[in-house]
């Protein structure tokens, strides 16, 4: 009992104080605070007072984190290398590794041990519950042992632990810490793995391969000139976007067997690109159709966002037109180039004049729209085929892309692809569905004519449709301007004219222009979606009613299929020569003008009806325009076979149609290429930019490694400052402190660093000699020796001018001109001063004795005049100016200090050498390191660097020409005070002698008067 009381008293005696900074004391107070918060939480019902409970829980977690951090420091010191490894933290995301991670883990362990479960992680919580209970139990044991050590072996304010290694409790603490460290590390891995997604070994390796892909992509871009090495060395932020985009292209095309191999199973693909696997497959299929020039153009666009500038001649593009309506155009043109020389020449002629024709068509289109807007009351204009195709593709279930194919958004001439994309149209789009079915039949007819080419084009079309639809959920980079806004392409006159090039002739158009009256009004109307789109489609179906009134009826689907078969047979058997001109003529009329008020309109429609077997003008327009270029190319071969029976007008119109078809082919290839590159850019940029958001941490690590690997291998040159053999070479200037003070209006504020002292010109330094004064030199040694005064004055001026020089060469001259070092000069000057003082005292005594004799033994005027004459001869004013000798003695007495100030300039020394700031990281007196707030101060007497506390004294330094108080260190201040006191004593004695001399002079003057 007595032993327990003694032990308790000893524990109270060894209780750590609140201001104790040792580890054990800090743990003791943190643990007490945590215990108090936990006890308060247990003292009331948290559901009754939720606000108080939430505040206490927040304090509890803070205290838990504090206790664990101190415990971690104790384990670092006691366990050292015996601690459990935590290499698994490399798998954690960066946002998980926070300072309060330990507190979160402890709080989670207590919750799991109490029976709680992680939301949506019930299975993992059940598995971790035994481990959490073991962690909390082990931590409680460690806390008890550490509190006991705080009372036993705490050393106040000790930086290390002082435990008794022979004590049983110390050994028990050591083993408990090892167990807790192992359990806590295991729980950390389990808990974090359950809360966030931790990379597996395979995923870690895949991300390393992605880093290799990024590095190879960057090296390839540097090699072909897409990027510059300076951008890599400067860590250009633009590369953060360019490298992932280029890596997608390179991984799909250049390094096809790398980490972006789309042929591997989806579960083996990296998690970064796994969500984009479908769109990446479509992008890969489209990239394989690009030639080298177009691939380079796409990569340049991904790097610089410049405009696409592709020059695609006829037959030179490796990308076939992906639209079904032109499936046979590239093949036909190539066949014509190989088998028919006349077609080749026609193609060249047409392509040469294509630009001018497009401009004329745009102007004519604008004129027609302005002239005939008043005719809309006659009949309601139906929507254009391109608008219908856009509407068909913009179903409520489809993506907001303007069209499923690149050509639809720029030069669309049919809605067959749109009908294939819109698999679930609304029920009230009846007329639109009939038109879509008609165009599907036209597409089947084209497949019968050219099966292989059309099959390839349909496959490419599906790829583009998939890529376009997939780009709907991708968020493009909003910083890339209009290039990333393909969802709303305005149907301007340029776009409309480009799609109507194949429906205008060069000669017939001028003749038929006066007859065209029924123009459409809304050629430039924007496409819309959802309910507005349904109303537009319904309005389009209603606009076709006037055409039904002219004797044309819409046939059923079965009748249309029969007519299509009859049309196919008749097309293969009949002669194209007989109706080629009227066919193209009809297309022009039906596309631009759906009906005519002229009296010949009905005759033209009756003339076309036997050839096409299609009474509906809308279907006639789409199907005719769809096969226009193909028919024109076929007509070339048949025209050569029937030239003998053909007339001149038919031959000329056929030539126009051939040139127009070839010119249209060139334009379509160009627009298709640009639009395909544009869509590829949107898809690739969308995938790469989403990596910046969804996988920001992983992408940062990869890009950091890529930059470090590809930086310029320039060896870092270590700049070594050569040793200065001469003290004067350490400084760039020799500014006098007195000059600086005079320039700053006499301010005695301290200058914080040597760099703040501004050197002036040499003439300023030489002019500043008038401010110099020597405190240790006596000022009245020129009373009886004016010649020595002049000599010393000239030498002082010369020395003062030399010491004010700020160039290094002048300093070397000073060093060579001085016969001895500075301290030797000071000793010699001190000896000279002592000698002059003794000589001056002797002269004062002699003169006093002489004055005493004169006042007693001689009162004659001659003696008085001689005395006055002698006094005037000794005056430096009379010596310099050469004025008359009829001056009063008071004038001589007044001008004596001027000679004294000139003589004292000889004692001015060179200012001390300042130690550079970079050479003094600590105060030279108290050794306190300098910081951003503890600034450096130079002593003006010794040149050392001190802190503000050690250099808070001020004193004048006349020996350096500093007559006003400047900053000095404490040691120099003590020395200067001693020197000043000694010099003051000497000057007092000299002043007494001067006063006695002046009194004697006044007595002599009075006697003479």
UniProtKB/Swiss-Prot annotation:
Biased composition (Low complexity): 327-348, 364-398, 406-427, 562-575, 780-798, 822-878
Region span, Disordered: 313-460, 497-629, 777-905
Gene Ontology CC terms: early endosome membrane
Binding site for Zn(2+) 2: 939, 942, 969, 972
Molecular-function GO term, any one: zinc ion binding
Positions bearing Phosphoserine: 541, 807
Keyword Zinc-finger: yes
UniProt-listed InterPro entries: FYVE_LST2, LST-2, Znf_FYVE, Znf_FYVE-rel, Znf_FYVE_PHD, Znf_RING/FYVE/PHD
Stored CDD domains: FYVE_LST2
Annotated Basic residues bias: 576-601, 609-627
Biased composition (Acidic residues): 430-458
Superkingdom per UniProt: Eukaryota
Keyword vocabulary terms for this entry: Metal-binding, Phosphoprotein, Zinc, Zinc-finger
Function noted in UniProt: Negative regulator of epidermal growth factor receptor (EGFR) signaling.
Family, similarity comment: Belongs to the lst-2 family.
UniProt name for this protein: Lateral signaling target protein 2 homolog
Taxonomic source organism: Drosophila persimilis (Fruit fly)
The organism's taxonomic lineage, starting at the top: Eukaryota, Metazoa, Ecdysozoa, Arthropoda, Hexapoda
